[in-house]
Amino acid sequence: MKTPRLPIALQQAVMRCLREKLAQANLKLGRNYPEPKLVYQQRGTSAGTAWLESYEIRLNPVLMMENQQAFVDEVVPHELAHLLVWKHFGRVAPHGKEWKWMMEAVLGVPARRTHQFELESVRRNTFPYRCQCQQHQLTVRRHNRVVRGEATYRCVKCGEPLVAE
């Protein structure tokens, strides 16, 4: 899949949000944390990821083009919060109480762990699996782990193992 060209205005909106939220956090925390590097190379169904050691935020350009305002309002602060928590508290649970506090009390953004974006444009081949209550779509990676006997997956609703259809 070809990566879309991101409009300059969108990149500027992302950078403006990042800088505003970082300044807000630095003021509230009494710190001077540096600006993280922004990279538009996240792939797959993740909207973004925070890379702690390299202090960078990777954003999915395909999902960003399709959900521009949500990226600015939610995804950028979400990933920034991970980096700030790591700088402020060290290594803690990814979406634990420190992250929730950073999102809500410091950045002023609702703490949601996952996005609700439409994924059709970024979804790769999936394999149908079934439990007792519904059908599931496993990614190629998960399907191959099942085939090799390296993993089994269970339904989060009924708890039953998933079986290939």
Swiss-Prot record:
Its main location: cytoplasm. InterPro entries: SprT-like_domain (IPR006640), SprT_Zn_ribbon (IPR035240), Uncharacterised_SprT (IPR023483). Residues 19-163 form the SprT-like domain. Keywords: Cytoplasm, Metal-binding, Zinc. GO terms for cellular component: cytoplasm. It comes from the Bacteria. The keyword Metal-binding applies. GO terms for biological process: response to stress. The active site is at residue 79. GO terms for molecular function: zinc ion binding. Zn(2+) binds at residues 78, 82. Gene3D superfamilies: Metalloproteases ('zincins'), catalytic domain. Binds 1 zinc ion. Its cofactor is Zn(2+). It is found in: Cytoplasm. Belongs to the SprT family. This is Protein SprT. The lineage of its organism: Bacteria, Pseudomonadati, Pseudomonadota, Gammaproteobacteria, Enterobacterales. The gene is sprT.
